[in-house]
Each structure stands twice: as C-alpha cells, then as structure tokens.
A protein has these predicted regions:
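Conserved catalytic cores of very large enzyme subunits
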Residues: 1-126, 130-223
Length: 223
C-alpha cells in the first residue's frame, strides 16, 4: 500500500496506517502520574508515579492500564476519521473496482469491500524494552538508582545528573544484544498491545491489525 504495508488486490480497503502508537510516551506518563514531561500538562490518568511504585510489577500494572486508556482514545479518534471519510469523502470510482462494493451497493469507505482492515503501528518497541530493562535492573533489582533520583533526572532531562544518565547508558542491558530477558520484555508488551487491539472492530466492520514501524517514526516520536 504505497510503502511497506502488504494488502490483497481488488478486494480490500486496508487502511494500513490508521494510527501510530508511541509506547514510550505511555511509559513516560506511567512514571510521571500522567503528566507530559515536555509540556507539563496532565494528559493521562494518574495511576501513580515512579516514586510510588513499590515493585517493578506494580509499575508494569500501571503501564498496562495506561495502554488500555490510550488505545481506547486512539480507537475513538480512528472511528471519527473513518466516519468523516464515509460522509465527506466517498470514493465511487475506487469502489467500482473493489470486490463486493457493487454487489453490496456500498462505498468502500462505508464497509463495502470484501475485507475491511485497519492497521495500527506500534512505535518504540526496542526503546520500551530498553527502558523497562533499565528500570527493572537498576531501580528495582540492584537499586543502583533510587526511584526519586531517576524521576527527577527524567523531569530535568538529566541536566543536573549526568552520572545517572551514564549509569543508564552503560549498566543497563539493551534490546537486541542477546540478553534474553530484555528481548522478552519487548516481545511481552508487543503481544499485549496486539491482544488489546484485537478487542476492537473498526468503523467499517473489519478488524484492526497490528504492525511495527522503525526508522522513520522512532526519531520524531523520541524527540
């Protein structure tokens, strides 16, 4: 579909890039009580902060709830966009060459195609695994960095604690470097995201499919 997404020919309206979901942003909000570290605005629910989670498992539980909250908001936004497409921008010429639209008497934007898929892209899987691994090892297991210290360092972008940044860079395991439990953290949350998304049906009556983007999305979403 124009770039890297796969689709079938002549029978599918595959909105393959319906949304991009920034996993690390959800983790940032988990650590900071729902407050955006860039703007200072509260944009997510407050399930606690890094200073209040007594265990790594408690942090993961809060992160899981943040995912639920923002996935639901994302789906609502996708539905509004799809409704606008159907109402304001129907595509009769495209519908004429897509299987089942003529038979159903429905435009592709209204769900007339044989298949009606929407793709949601997970962004920052590797960065999420790195972040989770650093939290687990250095904050909770080995206690080399206190929760309060790391939270303050994050809130000030490490300007006042370069040593904390150095410890994170050099002492935390990294995704994709044959550290099995770190790679498993990435796989765990990618699977969790996919399962959460599978609960929803898109506006055209089809399924949401989960993808992963790298390169073009990691840099702007990490800024």
């Amino acid at each position: 579909v124009g770039c890297v997404e796969l689709t079938t020919q002549g029978n599918n309206l595959g909105w393959s890039d319906a949304a991009m979901f920034n996993l690390n942003k959800a983790l940032e909000l988990t650590l900071n009580g729902g407050v955006d570290l860039i703007t200072g605005e509260k944009i997510g629910p407050d399930y606690g902060s890094l200073a209040t989670y007594e265990s790594f498992e408690a942090l993961e539980e809060s992160f899981d709830r943040q995912l639920d909250y923002f996935i639901d908001r994302m789906i609502k936004a996708c539905e509004e966009v799809e409704e606008a497409h159907m109402t304001l921008l129907p595509t009769p010429f495209l519908s004429a060459v897509v299987r089942d639209c003529m038979e159903n008497g429905m435009d592709v934007t209204a769900g007339g195609a044989h298949y009606n898929l929407s793709g949601i892209q997970m962004i920052q899987v590797a960065n999420l695994a790195d972040s989770m691994a650093a939290l687990k090892k250095l904050v909770y297991d080995e206690k080399k960095i206190s929760p309060e210290r790391l939270l303050k360092a994050l809130q000030t972008d490490f300007r006042e604690d370069e040593l904390c940044r150095t410890i994170l860079l050099n002492k935390a395991p990294k995704y994709g470097n044959d550290v099995e439990w770190t790679d498993e953290l990435g796989a765990k949350w990618a699977e969790a995201f996919k399962q959460k998304l599978s609960r929803y049906t898109n506006y055209r009556g089809g399924k949401y499919h989960t993808g992963m983007y790298t390169v073009s999305a990691h840099v702007p979403m990490g800024e």
